[in-house]
Amino acid sequence: MPGGKGKSVGGKAGAKDAAGKTQKSHSAKAGLQFPCGRVKRFLKNNTQNKMRVGAKAAVYVTAVLEYLTAEVLELAGNAAKDLKVKRITPRHLQLAIRGDEELDTLIRATIAFGGVLPRINRALLLKVEQKKKNKSDA
């Protein structure tokens, strides 16, 4: 019954192709968790002059994004673990990013509620140490 709404072959309903295998997404083929299709759509929409975007380019960009996210989350998780808490906050993200030299140069954005890095100027430390020495000598 061609053209009807009966059980017919085709379409994405069963998610199987002609050989009976289930379809795999680009992300699954590349072994990624992030969605390659969505990244490709963003790349196509955000390029000038409606340039074409290859499938491999989208997979590559997705892999880079996934790697950077995993790196930041690992460092932020370590920062949270050091502070003996179980939830990653913007403060932990700030400490993780600013603590790593390469991520610090890559991510120059201001993180909301991230705070500042704990740092005391050397000139101030020298004055405090000199006062302690003077008190101990006297």
From Swiss-Prot:
Ranges annotated as biased composition (Gly residues): 1-13
Keywords assigned by UniProt, alphabetized: Acetylation, Activator, Chromatin regulator, Chromosome, DNA-binding, Nucleosome core, Nucleus, Transcription, Transcription regulation
Processing after translation: Acetylated once deposited into chromatin.
Region: Disordered, residue numbers: 1-32
Family recorded in the similarity comment: Belongs to the histone H2A family.
Assembly notes: The nucleosome is a histone octamer containing two molecules each of H2A, H2B, H3 and H4 assembled in one H3-H4 heterotetramer and two H2A-H2B heterodimers. The octamer wraps approximately 147 bp of DNA. H2A or its variant H2A.Z forms a heterodimer with H2B. H2A.Z associates with the vps72/swc2 subunit of the SWR1 chromatin remodeling complex. Also interacts with rbp1/DNA-directed RNA polymerase II largest subunit.
Subcellular location: Nucleus; Chromosome
Superkingdom: Eukaryota
Protein name as it appears in the record: Histone H2A.Z
UniProt-listed GO biological process terms: CENP-A eviction from euchromatin; heterochromatin formation; nuclear-transcribed mRNA catabolic process, non-stop decay; regulation of transcription by RNA polymerase II; silent mating-type cassette heterochromatin formation; transcription elongation by RNA polymerase II
Modification type N6-acetyllysine: residues: 5, 12
Chief site of localization: nucleus
InterPro entries referenced in this protein's UniProt entry, alphabetically: Histone-fold, Histone_H2A, Histone_H2A/H2B/H3, Histone_H2A_C
Any one GO CC term of the record: euchromatin
A molecular function GO annotation: identical protein binding
Keyword Acetylation: yes
Task of the protein: Variant histone H2A which can replace H2A in some nucleosomes. Nucleosomes wrap and compact DNA into chromatin, limiting DNA accessibility to the cellular machineries which require DNA as a template. Histones thereby play a central role in transcription regulation, DNA repair, DNA replication and chromosomal stability. DNA accessibility is regulated via a complex set of post-translational modifications of histones, also called histone code, and nucleosome remodeling.
